[in-house]
Amino acid sequence: MAREKFERNKPHVNIGTIGHVDHGKTTLTAAITNVLAKKGQAQVQNYADIDGAPEERERGITINTAHVEYETEKRHYAHVDCPGHADYVKNMITGAAQMDGAILVCAATDGPMAQTKEHILLAKQVGVPALVVALNKCDMVDDEEIIELVEMEIRELLSSYDFPGDDIPVIQVSGLKAIEGEAEWEAKIDELMDAVDASIPEPEREVDKPFLMAIEDVFSITGRGTVATGRIERGIVKVGEEVEVVGIRDPRKTTVTGVEMFRKLLDEGMAGDNVGLLLRGIQKEDIERGMVLVKPGSITPHTKFEGQVYVLKKEEGGRHTPFFAGYRPQFYIRTTDVTGQITAFTAEDGSNVEMVMPGDNIQMTGELICPVAMEMGMRFAIREGGRTIGAGVVSKIIE
């Protein structure tokens, strides 16, 4: 059969494999491409192709990530797989590879292990909306009761992290046997992908979300007023619409009287556009880099929050020494540095942590000296003297 022309007429969804080391994430990823390739919906990627992922840099942090794409009858998927545990932590916290959902791989031979838990917690903290469980290596377990016990254990674990443990699909698979072409295990990969199609919700497109643009620069045009430039992160803004300026000072409303892109006037700007917005009744000194323009009421300014943070190792250009609660770095949020204080660190089990070492993945409570437009899932960097020493994501807003 001729390979069907690859067309982007299906909804696009970003997913990834997560789970404990050696539970078969990469093998399963290879198995998905092998099985779908037989229907002309993927190109075969073998273990070595995926495992030899090139290094990428995201916000000054080096991350190894493999990107694989394939499609099902219903959707087009971009799938990320990371070779090492630290790569997952960095990837999920920086948002380098945005995930709309994830396949949690757990070996039936081992059951949930330390990183199984850590990845579920990370998925919760960074806002991965949905999970599907692939119970891998089921060909190696003869006793159906053992498989049932492992499934129960995973469901309880998911529920303990506020995922709907009773409802999440758990599919018994064998990545290795599927690659070897055994029909019953190939069928299980199809079953897994059906579950992914059905259980991982289609993401809302950026353009359909409420308008937000982080201000990068401000200048005044004589006789016309003040222009704020930046890249529209999401939504659409039309000439004549009211927007709100949020962050650093008290929020205030203004009307967009013009949208410019590449020196041309437009009726509207949309997600992804780099634009200049002409604002009515605003002086150049009223607004500055670090503020955002938003659909009124869609986002609020805050100073206190909790975040999940990865602290860079010395080899990654991070600090050489640990730091403690009370540490005052800069938080780089969207387009600007804001000074803040880290008031507390919390371990995975909820206990207080005194000292944080380079290379740690930790929950922290932070307080900024001035309010910034903030929401759950927002990414930030922690810097000192212009150098990135950590990456984080807002997991909770306090005030």
UniProtKB/Swiss-Prot annotation:
Keyword annotations of the record: Cytoplasm, Elongation factor, GTP-binding, Hydrolase, Magnesium, Metal-binding, Nucleotide-binding, Protein biosynthesis
Catalytic activity field: GTP + H2O = GDP + phosphate + H(+)
Location of the region described as G5 in the Swiss-Prot/TrEMBL record: 174-176
Enzyme class: hydrolase
Protein EC: 3.6.5.3
InterPro entries recorded: EF-Tu_GTP-bd, EF-Tu_GTPase, EFTu-like_2, EFTU_2, G_TR_CS, P-loop_NTPase, Small_GTP-bd, T_Tr_GTP-bd_dom
Region described as G3: 81-84
Gene Ontology terms, MF aspect: GTP binding; GTPase activity; translation elongation factor activity
Highest rank taxon of the organism: Bacteria
Subcellular location: Cytoplasm
Chain segments carrying region G2: 60-64
Protein residues bound to Mg(2+): 26
Protein task: GTP hydrolase that promotes the GTP-dependent binding of aminoacyl-tRNA to the A-site of ribosomes during protein biosynthesis.
Domain tr-type G: 10-204
Region (G1): 19-26
Location, primary (coarse class): cytoplasm
A Pfam family reported for this protein in Swiss-Prot or TrEMBL: GTP_EFTU_D3
Protein name: Elongation factor Tu
Family to which this protein belongs: Belongs to the TRAFAC class translation factor GTPase superfamily. Classic translation factor GTPase family. EF-Tu/EF-1A subfamily.
GO CC annotations on file: cytosol
Species of provenance: Synechococcus sp. (strain CC9902)
Assembly notes: Monomer.
Residues that coordinate or bind GTP: 19-26, 81-85, 136-139
